[in-house]
Swiss-Prot record:
GO cellular component, one term: plasma membrane
Lineage: superkingdom: Eukaryota
Lineage: Eukaryota, Metazoa, Ecdysozoa, Nematoda, Chromadorea
Protein location: Cytoplasm; Cell membrane
Name this polypeptide is given: Protein sdf-9
């Protein structure tokens, strides 16, 4: 076995060209004082725009609409809104017709910090001008997560959204795999990550002209900054969708991370969460097909470095996941970065 570079090194290399880029984009958006974390900002073309209002004259929100056409999936990544930006968050939920919000809470004691709780309790109705937010139900699930159902009303418009609060996955920890799998099962059973875009709604959205970003019907993935955990979750979901869809030659984890960074600066920057991507996908592979247990050792070893050559990789496993495309070599990575990243000026 020959190791070329360690995973943590490649994560830092991918971020090397981001600080200057983030400063340039932040300055362009004139959003320094509106972002909780200045460096975590959306690339301009992927920034969700809201309908301007008296409280938000240019319709800005720190949220990225990320689209992966190969898989036919979109996601909105954003951070936890500060108290004075909660109205903008719920406005985005309504305007984007997002069916689901997945919030990764920072408090592992199953209690929300004050700034994490941006929604009403049962029986309460929060009003933001003509927009009202009401909680309808609440449930605690095995797997360390809670669900809430909210209904949003604005004039004649009504929109329902399912909200997940996920505990046990913080900036410095990863979730227990059993809990993560329980979460994914509920999401799969409820269709939580599927974009809700009935033909009639999609037709109306294409026929109308919008002041804001047209409805994407995309789930909202939310962590404190909308970067590391949210980005890692998106990559895991994409990879599992690819595996289930039997897509070939697309299993490059690094490629997906670079694409995420192209749409949201400093997305998936933490090596710990980078590692969890591999652990979650490998665990899914092994559970999905029990015969892969015979290949568990080489798969785990492969996932623990950025590139590993095996003298005798079994052809059966190679046929299924095509491991040589999981990583881009340095030359390919640099070429890819040049093609997707705008030049720093």
């Amino acid at each position: 076995m020959e190791k070329y570079s360690i995973r943590s090194n490649i994560v830092h290399k991918l971020d090397d060209n981001q600080p200057l880029l983030s400063e340039r984009v932040t300055a362009r958006l004139e959003a320094v004082n509106r972002n909780r974390v200045v460096k975590i900002v959306p690339q301009h073309r992927y920034n969700v725009r809201l309908t301007p209002s008296m409280l938000n004259r240019d319709g800005y929100i720190n949220a990225s609409l990320m689209e992966f056409s190969d898989v036919g999936q979109k996601y909105i990544l954003t951070g936890i809104p500060s108290e004075d930006k909660v109205f903008a968050f719920w406005q985005m939920v309504l305007e984007q017709r997002s069916p689901t919000i997945i919030q990764f809470a920072d408090n592992v004691e199953e209690k929300l910090e004050h700034y994490d709780k941006y929604f009403p309790d049962k029986g309460d109705v929060w009003s933001y001008g003509h927009l009202q937010v009401e909680r309808k139900s609440y449930a605690i699930h095995q797997g360390n997560f809670h669900t809430r159902n909210f209904i949003l009303r604005k004039g004649n418009e009504t929109h329902r959204v399912l909200h997940f609060t996920v505990f046990g996955w913080t900036e410095t920890t990863t979730p227990i795999m059993q809990d993560f799998l329980a979460l994914r099962k509920v999401m799969k059973d409820t269709g939580a990550l599927n974009m809700i875009n009935p033909a009639s709604a999609l037709f109306r959205s294409t026929m109308r002209r919008y002041i804001h970003t047209p409805p994407s019907f995309a789930p909202i993935i939310q962590s404190a900054r909308g970067s590391s955990r949210a980005g890692a979750f998106v990559v895991i979901d994409l990879l599992i969708r690819m595996i289930d869809g039997k897509k070939t030659n697309l299993y490059s984890v690094e490629d997906l991370i670079v694409k995420c960074k192209h749409m949201r600066i400093h997305c998936v920057p933490v090596a710990l969460h980078h590692s969890f991507i591999y652990e979650a996908v490998l665990d899914y592979l092994l559970r999905r097909n029990p015969r892969f247990q015979d290949f568990k050792e080489p798969l785990i070893a492969y996932s623990e470095s950025c590139f590993v050559k095996w003298s005798s990789m079994d052809k059966e496993i190679e046929k299924f996941i095509n491991t040589k495309t999981w990583f881009l070599n340095e030359s390919s990575r640099n070429k890819f970065l040049r093609s997707v990243m705008p030049p720093v000026v």
